[in-house]
A protein has these predicted regions:
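C-terminal domain-closing interface element
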Residues: 158-166
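Short cysteine clusters
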Residues: 106
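Short, small-residue alpha-helix embedded
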Residues: 113-124
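Cysteine-based protein phosphatase catalytic domain of the PTP/DSP
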Residues: 5-6, 13-102, 123-154
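Conserved G/P- and acidic residue-centered "switch" motifs that form tight phosphate/ATP-binding loops
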Residues: 109
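Non-catalytic regulatory/accessory regions that flank a structured catalytic core
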Residues: 1-3
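Short, flexible helix/strand-to-coil boundary loops that buttress conserved ligand/catalytic motifs
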Residues: 44, 117, 163
Length: 166
């Protein structure tokens, strides 16, 4: 059975990889930790939010686990460099290989997050168009499912040009 996530989040691979909005509310962070998340991939620039890494670590310790945080800053509505996207995907895959469930987020969980999730799906065998369609299916039922993800034409073009070997 899939563990519950906050209303703005969704599973890409149940119990392994989830994505969504910034976990600003203490309740959302607690729900993510309760769902088993142990690695947070933060796509927001430092200073955009107050930060949650220490609270995530505290909640995880109380549950007998560890929560790690990695920041890969991408400006809002922006795109990463190809090398940065590789580093993000490598971080996700490294934590998954270590059996550490991962949560990927930006601010709203749409543009930057959708771009990363779709590129991760391409890395793992989906054609770019199929990855974008799968992303919409995965987001069905979230609080903002009607919103575009990725948000911009440039973000969608980035995914469409992404190849597994990138």
């Amino acid at each position: 059975m899939q563990r519950a996530l906050p209303a703005s989040a969704y599973w890409i691979e149940p119990q392994r990889l989830a994505a969504g909005a910034y976990p600003a509310a203490p309740f959302d962070l607690a729900v993510l930790i309760a769902a088993g998340i142990g690695g947070f991939v933060d796509l927001t620039p430092a200073g955009d939010h107050g930060g949650y890494a220490s609270e995530a670590a505290r909640l995880a310790r109380a549950a007998g686990r560890e929560a790690l945080h990695r920041r890969f800053p991408i400006r809002d509505f922006g795109l990463p460099e190809i090398a940065t996207m590789r580093a993000i995907l490598d971080a996700i895959d490294g934590w998954l290989a270590a059996r550490r469930p991962v949560y990927v987020h930006c601010h709203a969980g749409l543009g930057r997050t959708g771009t990363v999730v779709a590129c991760w799906l391409v890395r793992h065998g989906r054609a770019p168009a199929d990855a974008l369609a799968e992303l919409q299916r995965l987001r069905h039922g979230t609080r903002d499912a009607a919103a575009a993800s990725p948000e911009t034409d440039a973000q969608r073009a980035f995914v469409e040009s992404w190849r597994p070997g990138n």
